[in-house]
Amino acid sequence: MGTGTLSSLLLLLLLVTIGDADMKGHFDPAKCRYALGMQDRTIPDSDISVSSSWSDSTAARHSRLESSDGDGAWCPAGPVFPKEEEYLQVDLRRLHLVALVGTQGRHAGGLGKEFSRSYRLRYSRDGRRWMDWKDRWGQEVISGNEDPGGVVLKDLGPPMVARLVRFYPRADRVMSVCLRVELYGCLWRDGLLSYTAPVGQTMQLSEMVYLNDSTYDGYTAGGLQYGGLGQLADGVVGLDDFRQSQELRVWPGYDYVGWSNHSFPSGYVEMEFEFDRLRSFQTMQVHCNNMHTLGARLPGGVECRFKRGPAMAWEGEPVHHALGGSLGDPRARAISVPLGGHVGRFLQCRFLFAGPWLLFSEISFISDVVNDSSDTFPPAPWWPPGPPPTNFSSLELEPRGQQPVAKAEGSPTAILIGCLVAIILLLLLIIALMLWRLHWRRLLSKAERRVLEEELTVHLSVPGDTILINNRPGPREPPPYQEPRPRGTPTHSAPCVPNGSALLLSNPAYRLLLATYARPPRGPGPPTPAWAKPTNTQACSGDYMEPEKPGAPLLPPPPQNSVPHYAEADIVTLQGVTGGNTYAVPALPPGAVGDGPPRVDFPRSRLRFKEKLGEGQFGEVHLCEVEDPQDLVTSDFPISVQKGHPLLVAVKILRPDATKNARNDFLKEVKIMSRLKDLNIIRLLGVCVQDDPLCMITDYMENGDLNQFLSAHQLENKVTQGLPGDRESDQGPTISYPMLLHVGAQIASGMRYLATLNFVHRDLATRNCLVGENFTIKIADFGMSRNLYAGDYYRVQGRAVLPIRWMAWECILMGKFTTASDVWAFGVTLWEVLMLCRSQPFGQLTDEQVIENAGEFFRDQGRQVYLSRPPACPQTLYELMLRCWSREPEQRPPFSQLHRFLADDALNTV
């Protein structure tokens, strides 16, 4: 070895030693190379799974390095060429830094000849999102074995932070491959799950210096990297000269991520860090470059804020630490920022510029886990067992091998006694079931007899709630109905008695609810007693619903401390044009309906028909154009149509043969619509009520409904990997992730406005949102009337039409509609937006299973199913959606908080 080489090695060793001293408490990837338990069986058989195996003797449990169990290795059932879909998966149970992998073929005492010459790795931190491992030059393929017996170790540069690791053997032709593996690394004690930062920039000197985070494994959108880890958490500390690197054959600036002061008018770079659990933070250490002769300076100061949950506000005053940006010593160094023991799961830190450039190579934290029982979040999605999945992102766990059990020989007497005891227990169980069934039959028969009375109010006490249902007389026969074809789902033969309907109908309150819906009003009934407040909790069967002002309470009020922050809306029957009740709204003053609608009369001659959007029981919805609208429409909002261009409007038309009650409801709907004044809610433009047919004219947006609009788009920067329907060859308009958040924020803003009026929109979904110019969103209400979305609604035994996939469990089982249930629907709508409306919510479940899942929420035994996280959705935003689906309505965030998060914090939170 030459003198120059020896000097270089000594210098490198000195630099690493200095870096370790500076970055106190930070891990050293060179020392993180312990075997993680495949060979010594610390990893149990149950944590090793495979896509398939040739036989039981080549199953997953035989894939341990240097093991000769079974036939000597794991061998997949099918060929790995050309699809490369066979994999071996290892679950480490906790996050680990994996720095090295070892592979081996099948030797089997000289009888085996199978091995893999190359392979790929995929890894996941949560079991939902899978990432391809790539080296520092973007290559995925790792060279493997050259013979069946030898062990080949491969350094992973960069290392990966993972809980689950999959090996995908490769071949260049159809051939058999077998594999044994081991993983090397150490436990990831930092607890850092991801960081968000602006994309690194390029510095132009005599040569281009690329200061990007080249190993970041999250998403990139709108100049922001989020949802992953990269070079700032890989343990590699940069050199004093940022143009040089400790890695071989890389570009100048590789070790650092940097930003120019000119690109940040605010004077600081903002980063956010997400951790695995609640922690008490003592110190943040940032390794910075200080080569001020080339423009790199230490930060002038740092300020950090903390919060405990994704949708919570930042707590208290920020922690400030002044640094000043040293000009003296040009060496790179680690700066320590004391954090004072503040507690949180999320940190937001701002690094102030003291010079032209900020260059960081590593950021680490010294913290302790805090055991706080109050910091709870909804559980991760759980899916019931089904057929073996075939996509890469599915988990397949092989059951632990069974050990032989010695059989004890018993006497015939003992066997006979055991059989008798079993028979007696079975008989007792059957008797108990029969008694329980008889009890419910009596309850239901009483409920049915009550429905037949001419005027009756029923009180049903449920733990913590009181449901008040009023039934008015009406015809016995339900309205005609033609079974819709579900959208995007195969046709199934319906069972004679659906399980989901049985679950609904087992609730006496819901039987009364459906009985009410089955009888449309046929005229004024007998006078209602003064003490009977007319209410109706029917689900989604008209356009608008309006609660009356409460009179004297029928029951004593609950204690003040038991009142949730969401109030239930008392509801009266209001059958609208499109046949579906949408809003539950506060009562109008007495006689307000009789005063007639606001006189914004619209000349029918100016309406030009374009197409029929939908129809309901009492009317239709048409899409029309209005010529020269500026001289016709007066409102509180400007009309964004150029002079000489027509205005698109939706016209709700009441059929001339509609009943008197339907006409009164139509006028009441006009009155309600006239009260809605918000930029994100469709507005009433005018009415035609001088002669038949009665019409109301509302906004309609040029880009149609949000569901159709988003499904025609693709997400920028190829973030949509894993979305249904995406293909490399698809050509179409794109939409950015920040724009999706902007869409969600507008929906939250409109719903916030409705909540301030105590309005409850009971059918919130992308089909009921309209898209205008510059992605303007307005919430509408006639999605139910469109045949295109018939598959989104479920008919309960031919009576109530319910959007059950968007409904909170208490709406499905108890008919309770509140602002909190709208928050639930908003979470589903946000899921639709982030999926670009490519999938129906719970698309893998039948309608009956969705209803049964609502029952699981009621039982609260941990078996309820949640919507899975969309591929492009950061974990923190998904946790916010899970909070929207909390079992207890009072635990769901209000719309003001949802709007603030989506409008201000979402892009900076992952």
Curated annotation (Swiss-Prot):
Post-translational modification: Autophosphorylated in response to fibrillar collagen binding.
Chain ranges on the Extracellular side, renumbered to this chain: 22-414
Cytoplasmic compartment residues: 436-910
Positions of the UniProt region annotated as Disordered: 467-494
Binding site for Ca(2+) 1: 212, 231, 254, 256
Disulfide bonds: 32-186, 75-178, 304-349
Modified residues (Phosphotyrosine): 481, 510, 517, 737, 789, 793-794
Transmembrane segments: 415-435
GO MF entries: ATP binding; collagen binding; metal ion binding; protein tyrosine kinase collagen receptor activity
Functional note: Tyrosine kinase that functions as a cell surface receptor for fibrillar collagen and regulates cell attachment to the extracellular matrix, remodeling of the extracellular matrix, cell migration, differentiation, survival and cell proliferation. Collagen binding triggers a signaling pathway that involves SRC and leads to the activation of MAP kinases. Regulates remodeling of the extracellular matrix by up-regulation of the matrix metalloproteinases MMP2, MMP7 and MMP9, and thereby facilitates cell migration and wound healing.
Record text on subunit structure and interactions: Homodimer. Interacts (via PPxY motif) with WWC1 (via WW domains) in a collagen-regulated manner. Forms a tripartite complex with WWC1 and PRKCZ, but predominantly in the absence of collagen. Interacts (tyrosine phosphorylated) with SHC1. Interacts with SRC. Interacts with MYH9. Interacts with CDH1. Interacts with PTPN11. Interacts with NCK2.
Protein name: Epithelial discoidin domain-containing receptor 1
The species this protein was found in: Rattus norvegicus (Rat)
